[in-house]
């Protein structure tokens, strides 16, 4: 199976009203469709621009959590509409979502053209999220069985912990999505190196989509550095560098790349090396977190 994936280098804008957000998202999806994308990947915390719709709380960390979380059902309805309209799988920008017990989680949602929705919460919080922002990690870890293959999601920092993606790979994952939000180049490179390592270990693709640009009005996502990338194992039919395509640093844009899952199957069966098969031979390589397989076909 082969298709085009699009990874967003997405700017956090100050928006005057809901219609401005709707127009922005619709335009981005239309451009992805014009590029032939069957899968569009938005970044971590891209939804925080919705905090600007409430000027009274947009400058407050706690207040912005509540205001954005309240809009998530409306945001999700728009994504579902656009996924159906364009026949596209869309990973929405992650958003803070309130749980019944009062905690907030960082949640990514994967929409299919047929109307199915898969949810992956971030498991491991950064220092800012846990010490200043009050966002909690949340299990379970999942993969999603879709018409585009078996997809896993590691939100930003999660990609820096190899057992998560390894467990997803053993559950059948062929394509890892890595939405990110990093305020400095150090963070961007940590996530990029993590995503590339996960692609090498799991002999799979990794699609990395970051936020970019300045949003000085926001105390949460004021600085955003990064470049999108699609990473592969450095073996077989893939580039020697393991870098399929990379975007221009900090520039708002879509990055397009061709995904061929037949290459993943072939490499896992008969690659120059067999990282996927040989994982258990390393000392301590046996115990992995559980993974829930969700049918989105």
Predicted segments — roles?
Residues 69-71, 75-90, 160-252:
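CN hydrolase (nitrilase-like) catalytic-core segments centered on the catalytic cysteine
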Residues 92, 107-110, 142, 208, ...:
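Short beta-strand scaffold segments in enzyme catalytic cores
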Residues 99-174, 184-197, 273, 283:
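Active-site catalytic loop in hydrolytic enzyme cores
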């Amino acid at each position: 199976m082969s298709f085009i994936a699009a990874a967003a280098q997405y700017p956090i804008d100050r928006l005057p009203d809901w219609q401005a957000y709707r127009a922005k998202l619709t335009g981005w999806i239309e451009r992805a469709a014009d590029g032939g994308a069957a899968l569009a990947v938005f970044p971590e915390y891209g939804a925080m621009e919705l905090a600007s719709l409430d000027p009274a709380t947009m400058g407050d960390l706690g207040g912005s959590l509540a205001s954005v979380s309240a809009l998530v059902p409306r945001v999700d309805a728009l994504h579902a509409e656009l996924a159906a309209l364009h026949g596209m799988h869309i990973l929405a920008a992650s958003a803070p979502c309130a749980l019944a017990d009062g905690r907030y989680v960082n949640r990514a949602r994967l929409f299919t053209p047929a109307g199915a929705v898969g949810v992956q919460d971030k498991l491991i919080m950064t220092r800012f999220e846990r010490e200043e922002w009050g966002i909690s990690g949340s299990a379970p870890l999942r993969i999603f069985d879709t018409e585009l293959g078996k997809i896993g999601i590691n939100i930003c920092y999660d990609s820096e912990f190899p057992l998560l993606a390894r467990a997803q790979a053993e559950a059948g994952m062929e394509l890892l999505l890595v939405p990110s939000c990093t305020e400095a180049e150090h963070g961007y490179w940590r996530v990029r190196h993590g995503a590339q390592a996960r692609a090498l270990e799991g002999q799979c693709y990794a699609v990395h989509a970051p936020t970019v640009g300045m949003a000085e009005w926001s105390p949460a996502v004021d600085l955003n550095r990064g470049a999108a990338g699609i990473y592969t194992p450095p073996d077989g039919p893939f580039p020697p560098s393991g870098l399929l395509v990379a975007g221009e640093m900090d520039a708002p844009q879509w990055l397009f790349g061709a995904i061929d899952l037949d290459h993943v199957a072939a490499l896992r069966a008969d690659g120059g090396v067999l990282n996927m098969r040989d994982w258990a031979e390393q000392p301590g390589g046996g115990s992995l977190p559980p993974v829930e397989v969700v049918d989105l076909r």
